[in-house]
Amino acid sequence: MKSDMRYIELNGVHRDEYLITFEDIDPNYRLSLTSALAYFQNSVAAFMTDRHIAAFDIRPEGFLWVISEISMKLSEKSPLWREKLVSEVKVSELTSTRAYFDFRLMRENGEEYASGTGIWSPVSLATGRPVQ
């Protein structure tokens, strides 16, 4: 993999802002779990895009990213439709085969709604196996 993970600079925190829209809510007008996870995935993808290692950057080299695990803690009350949220992602650990991303999703006032960790691994399109 030309974008060898051992030599990629993955420091810093990436922040995104989200406005909860109709497609992001459950029947009670609150942010759905699926949407919270989508914000996590989208923020990690933006983090990788800024560093030129997003899926569309590594696909021509014969690789893609696979999410192998996500764990997330949620506060009791989900944000409501039209609330603004801020996400933060950062790499907490990097190995030759995995990138561990920590995630936070906060309300505008800074109150944390969700936090968690996910594992992303580059996989060879030819073999379907993780890149070593």
Predicted regions and their residues:
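Hydrophobic beta-strand-centered segment that forms part of the acyl-chain substrate-binding groove
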Residues: 47-95
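Residues in flexible loops and secondary-structure boundaries
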Residues: 26-28, 33, 39, 75-82, ...
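Hot-dog-fold acyl-thioester-processing enzymes
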Residues: 1-67, 124-132
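HotDog/MaoC-like acyl-thioester-processing domains
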Residues: 3-7, 11-16, 71, 79-132
